[in-house]
Amino acid sequence: MSEVRIRPRQVLILIIVFLVVLMMVHRNGKRTCQGPEYLQAMFVQGDTLPTIYAVTPTYPRPAQKAELTRLSHLFMLLPHLHWIIVEDTNATTPLVRNLLDRAGLEKRSTLLNIKTPSEFKLKGKDPNWIKPRGVEQRNLALAWLRNHVDVDRHSIVFFMDDDNSYSTELFAEMSKIERGRVGVWPVGLVGGLMVERPLLTEDGTKVTGFNAAWRPERPFPIDMAAFAISMDLFIRNPQATFSYEVQRGYQESEILRHLTTRDQLQPLANRCTDVLVWHTRTEKTKLAAEEALLKKGQRSDGGMEV
């Protein structure tokens, strides 16, 4: 049998090829993300960060898919978020199911549904503040969380309305919430102010009050987007739910009074000086031309999902 000789140069080439292939496999198997450092860190450390359960009540309306599509992009970017969508319907809808499927979020989402009692539904031209909204939906989400979340693993609950605007950096801050704490931060464009924010001690470690202009006497005069809650607090306080029986603007205080006190709040967002969420609201859709078509038995979106 003839002897096979491999020259040193051939050995070197084989080693180089092997190393290149190894680097490519390693690179393809590793999570990568382009963007600011906090986003890269969250992307790489997603498996070690506390899961953030974002609870979004939603209801059928012309802009619903647009609102949820915008929010879905946050979840695509942030691997440690789990989206709990609760529809105000008698059954979950194809529109929301299709949206989650197209966004690739089926494994990082939970879709629930419960109808708001008719006596608490807005009617006609009712202003959106006249009745409490999302009470049934948020309470159903809390019941699901108490029954399904691993109590031994730290996780966080955030009530995420579908029409607000959120920076990805907000969720980096939220990930810092300690067990047994409620994290707080400023919210822009709310309560008649450019920003509502907690007021802190000089060292920035304690909340001493709030700058709220509307009903500042509330126990917690903050917006629903201004806080997130360590899940263990909900486990230890099963009575913590939202209620129809509270005054207008007191839903936040109603849930927080069961869970914490002002002096136990955890200030975040650079000592509550960074605005990372805005209380925006989509203008009511004007569809006069569509209504004229419907009167003729026609529609612009026949066979389409808008």
Curated annotation (Swiss-Prot):
Keywords: Glycoprotein, Golgi apparatus, Manganese, Membrane, Metal-binding, Signal-anchor, Transferase, Transmembrane, Transmembrane helix
Topological domain ranges for the Cytoplasmic compartment: 1-11
Listed PANTHER family: GALACTOSYLGALACTOSYLXYLOSYLPROTEIN 3-BETA-GLUCURONOSYLTRANSFERASE 3, GALACTOSYLGALACTOSYLXYLOSYLPROTEIN 3-BETA-GLUCURONOSYLTRANSFERASE BETA-1,3-GLUCURONYLTRANSFERASE
Family designation: Belongs to the glycosyltransferase 43 family.
Record topology, Lumenal segments: 30-306
Active-site residues (renumbered): E252 (proton acceptor)
Enzyme class: transferase
Source organism: Drosophila melanogaster
The EC number(s) this enzyme carries: 2.4.1.135
Protein name: Galactosylgalactosylxylosylprotein 3-beta-glucuronosyltransferase I
An MF annotation (GO) of this entry: metal ion binding
